[in-house]
């Protein structure tokens, strides 16, 4: 009888732990929202750092990803140069993680950051002579446009490398980092649609820069990458029987 009672208590405790953890994260994020409304960036940074460390301890990737990106945003608001250290942190994370899905998401984030930086600094990049066949400097402020474009393309390739995994992984599993949109419902909220869409957006942000580099009549590799992503998505959704996803992708293409 005692053994049965102990077993029941253990099972109940195991069921309670995840709920308590979720409540704790929710409480912390509510504090973040309050700090944000009060325009307290240092408090937001402190709280998101706490969430990140808690997520790391509990191996909760969605919480870690959301906390890291929020902390990164507010650190950059206070000190723009923090972007470089935080980007290196993401690149170190992607090397160390043993979770394929986390790795894909991190590559997608990194690609987006490089694309945003290049797009925001187009004028300066256009003044520089392209450097090819040379390892980029440690400081990306010294890079040329082609180096950023290559970083974006390489990280996107890694992000979408395992399309089978992305198709069978629901973005629901990455809440609260992922916010479910209405359109993603037509794709059954799979991670393939999410990361492919992010990849296309990142490539589009550097497409104009790439046009400048390839104005000698050669085909723009960035444009080719965009076409290739759509070209892979259409048959993938057709094969899985997602009619709505297939039609929407074909229309966007």
Residue ranges and their predicted role:
Residues 1-28:
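Bacterial Sec-dependent N-terminal signal peptides
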Residues 25-31, 35-253:
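Extracytoplasmic/secretory-pathway proteins
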